[in-house]
From Swiss-Prot:
Allosterically activated by GTP. Inhibited by UTP. NCBIfam families: pyrH_bact. Keywords: Allosteric enzyme, ATP-binding, Cytoplasm, Kinase, Nucleotide-binding, Pyrimidine biosynthesis, Transferase. The lineage of its organism: Bacteria, Pseudomonadati, Pseudomonadota, Gammaproteobacteria, Moraxellales. UMP binds at G56, D77, T138, G139, N140, P141, F142, F143, T144, T145. It catalyses: UMP + ATP = UDP + ADP. This is Uridylate kinase. Catalyzes the reversible phosphorylation of UMP to UDP.
Length: 241
């Protein structure tokens, strides 16, 4: 791959909380954080501009509390937004330990902890070579971090939205439960919507389709997978118009 150039100059990487938890199930697996920061630093070294949206499911899952009536949906979603801020802080410091200038930008104002999100500022930072981590989702309840990733990707004019998961692409059914699950190498947005494949939620998919921004789903735990995607190798599942 050394004779190849990156296929994208600017990307939006969606990291799920589940991916950050690694084998722990909950919390942050420091070895995973270290590997992710190294992979992202490698992209920066190639001149790729990197925006990141992080989830928060490794630190907080509100479904049970909401199911039992202990918190309302809005409160639960706000708690989830704060969980993404904690993950973002961890990722920022992991990248800065590798001498990567990193901006933590939040959809919710949080004083001295983050700076407020602005697409204009984010694009300026990216052009200067800084990594931008976008936290607190869209800042509104009822929207997933997948939707936030697509929204931020569109706003910063990313060439692709990359969804890093624990599975090496999109399947017709859960491969952990079905040995005969079929993996797709490529799909259209319409196929994802018609077949109700669990790539992202419908709002996120509709956003990407409307703005013609491709998606790629891949396994972040696989060695060199992120680099392979950037270099145009056959990795994971690509979703396009």
């Amino acid at each position: 791959m050394s004779d190849k150039n990156p296929q994208y100059s600017r990307i939006l990487l969606k990291l799920s909380g589940e991916a950050l938890a690694g084998g722990l199930g909950m919390g942050i697996d420091t070895s995973v954080l270290d590997k992710m920061s190294l992979a992202i630093a490698h992209l920066c070294g190639l001149g790729v501009q990197v925006g990141i949206v992080v989830g928060g499911g490794n630190l907080y899952r509100g479904s049970q509390l909401q199911k039992e009536g202990l918190v309302g949906r809005v409160t639960g979603d706000q708690m989830g937004m704060l969980a993404t801020v904690m993950n973002g802080l961890a990722m920022r410091d992991a990248l800065e330990r590798r001498n990567i200038n990193t901006r933590l930008m939040s959809a919710l104002p949080i004083g001295e902890v983050t700076e407020s999100y602005s697409s204009r500022n984010a694009i300026r930072y990216l052009k200067n070579g800084d990594v931008c981590i976008f936290v607190a989702g869209t800042g509104n309840p009822f929207f997933t971090t997948d939707t936030a990733a697509c929204l931020r990707g569109i706003e910063i004019e990313a060439g692709v939205i990359l969804k890093a998961t624990k599975v090496d692409g999109v399947y017709d059914k859960d491969p952990s439960e079905h040995a005969d699950a079929k993996k797709y190498d490529a799909l259209t947005f319409d196929e994802v919507l018609e077949q109700k494949l669990g790539v992202m939620d419908l709002t996120a998919i509709a956003l990407c389709r409307e703005h013609n921004v491709p998606l790629q789903v891949f396994d972040m735990n696989k060695p060199n997978s992120l680099l392979n995607v950037i270099m145009g190798e056959n990795e994971g599942t690509r979703v396009f118009h």
